[in-house]
Structures are given as structure tokens and as C-alpha cells.
């Protein structure tokens, strides 16, 4: 039987191993989840489920430091950023605990056919396939709305964060959720495909790579199952000539280095107006070069390791290929010698459309910088991408910012702020960044049977 290993990317030391789930265990988990869906837990009144979410939020808060430390050791996130991730998880749980009942109230529709309304009901067992970069937050985005609604979930987490997956499942059970409400499975891609094909599974949610999303969408489509996908992003950070440059640089550094750049909504393509480009690049380069690399548990560290040796090696290959095809290195550009999976903060300029890097997502501390002459060119460059997840625009003229935000082809745009997230706001993208929305009132309705009822008269 294969195992899932927890390895500290700061020093490459093995922390612990978990055995994978065999076919019998997966079959049993599906049986339990399906039975629970057909019970009063899912079909009955909502308050008992909301009480579990309230308890879960309290548990997360009470064990915040423990949870943050586990994540930082397992995937290399700075301890302060892990604490922030844990905090947003309790916020999401509380948001749905406090708002789900109102959101799911029947909605009236005026009609000549009679009294009409739409009710919201759970649809059944879901499969969730989630990544390692936010090992709790990604799970909570699926758990909280679907637990409130009454769907049951079988979760396949990324294989490099088994400890986070295991402790999350235990927290859900400790909060009072019955067996089958949320089940963690250490399984293969083939086993995921088999689950999606099972008639008892009614939907699948995936956050991950474009390749993984395409495979899941194909399998879901083959069996006519609802799916939502949150995939890669190549988000823009547009700095116009009237922007608060110091603040744009400060947040630009955060937006590129947070989680060692391993964020779908991280700023990756910096589009600068030519009037401020040289000043921005100078300040930005100095700030990136001043990053303190080290142990993510050390409060003084400002840039931790990449999540794994594979992640580091992919980034090395990407940057080397970009430079070989004409990109210019302003700073950085190499892996850091010694133990751990560290990579230098890097700026690339001079990337042309014939360079493969032009359309690639760099999942690490690498910033692509482009210079444009006007707003129209900024929008054209921003939209010349296969992806459409998020982005930000920096300007003192809010009307100008609104115009650009409306024209940029993404699911989310922030004006005078780096991309962010909050439980009450929808999260999702367009193009190859996926489809569907998570969080907010939209997220809880993705896997709901939106049932029309009409009383003729």
C-alpha cells in the first residue's frame, strides 16, 4: 500500500506518513456519505448543521496556533500567513453559520401562472479535489456552504499536505458533524475518476491546475455531473501614471511574495504605465531583493521555501527557458543553494508574445514586468491571456479605475488593493481559470437543486 508523506520543504525532512485508502475503504466512505445524505441530517431542518459550523469556527480559533504551525511545517508557508489562513477559515464557517438560513430562504417569482417560488435543496454526495497551497482554506470553501446546505463531501486533498487534510477532518467531526458529512480520502487520480462515475455522486468541485481541471471536467461531463473549477491565474497588477507609487510597490511585493508566490490570485504580470515604470521597477526590485529567506516558523523570515522540490525545479526550468527565449533578468533568477526548496525573488522584463513565458503562470516568486503607453494598451495586454481569475488596478482616479476594471476579462478586480478574499464575496474566474463561484451567497447555491414550485391560480 502506498503512503502519503508530510515533508518539511524548509529542510526536506520527513515528518510523518499516512497510508492511502484502498478500494474497500473508499467504497465504505461513499456508502456512509450516501446514507447520510438520505437521512434527516441532510433532509431535515438547517439549525443542527449551522450549529456544527459555529462549533467548528470556535474550535479553529482555539487551536489556531497549532493549525498554523502544522501548515507552515508541511508546505512552507510563513507562520504569520498560516495564522491568517486559519483566521479566514473560522470567518467562512461563521459566515455560513450566521447567513445560510437567510440565503436559502425560498425566493418568490411574480408570474401569470400563479404563486411561484424557488426552493434550495441539497443534491447529494460531492467529490472535492483540493490543492496544497492553502491547505485549510481550500477545504473550508467547499465544506462550509455544502455542510450548511446538506450535501455530503468526499475530499481528495493534495498528496503533499496529508497532515492538514487529516487534522481538518478530525476538527469537523469534533465540531459535531456525523460520519460521512466530510470524509478525507488519500486516493489516486484514477480513484477520483471512479468516484465521479458513481451514480451516487452528484457533483465535483476542483481547485487546481488546468490539466487536473480539464480531466475532472471531462469525467464529470461524461457522466452528466455538475462541476465547478477554480484553476490557474496569471493575474495582472496594473499601475497607472497617477497611482500612489509607494503603496503600489508595497502591496505589489506582498502580492508577488505571499505564500512564496504560490497563490492563484497572486500578482504575476505587472503592467506599468511608461511614465512611472522606471521608478516602480527600481523600488520594486530593491524591495524584492531585501526579502529575508529562511525558516517559515521564524517571525523574521519574509520569504519561505516553495512547497516541494518538484515545485522549485519547475520554476527553475520556467525561468531558464524564459531567459533563453529573450527575457531579461532584473534580479534573482536562481534556486538557492543548500537545504530546502528556496528560490530567489525574481523580476523578468522584455517578455514578448513569442516567448513561452508570455502565456505561462509562474507559481513562485517571479514577477513579469511589462510597460505600456496608455490605458487601452494596459487592458489589451491584461486580456491577452488564457486565464481570467483576478487582478488589480492602481490609480488615484477611481472613475478611471472602474473603467479599466470593467474592461479587464477576469472574475475579480480590485482597485487600489492587491487581490484578497472574504467569506461574503464571491470567488472565481473565467476563461481557463475555470467556472462557478465559491463563497458568498453564490457559492452555497452552486450545488443546490434550485427547485421551482408553482401553485396554479
Regions found by a protein language model. Give the residues of each.
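Residue-level signal for inorganic ion chemistry
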Residues: 12, 49, 71, 93, ...
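Short loop/turn microsegments at loop-to-beta-strand junctions
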Residues: 1-4, 267, 389
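Structural signal for hydrophobic packing residues in well-ordered secondary-structure cores
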Residues: 34-37, 41, 57-64, 68, ...
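N-terminal Rossmann-like NAD(P)+-binding subdomain of aldehyde/semialdehyde dehydrogenases
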Residues: 1-114
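Short, well-ordered beta-strand elements within core beta-sheets of diverse protein domains
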Residues: 15-21, 37-42, 128, 237-240, ...
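Rossmann-like NAD(P) dinucleotide-binding subdomain of oxidoreductase/dehydrogenase enzymes
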Residues: 105-247, 372
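ALDH superfamily catalytic-core signature
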Residues: 176, 211-352, 415
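Conserved C-terminal structural/oligomerization subdomain of aldehyde/semialdehyde dehydrogenase
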Residues: 11-17, 201, 292, 335, ...
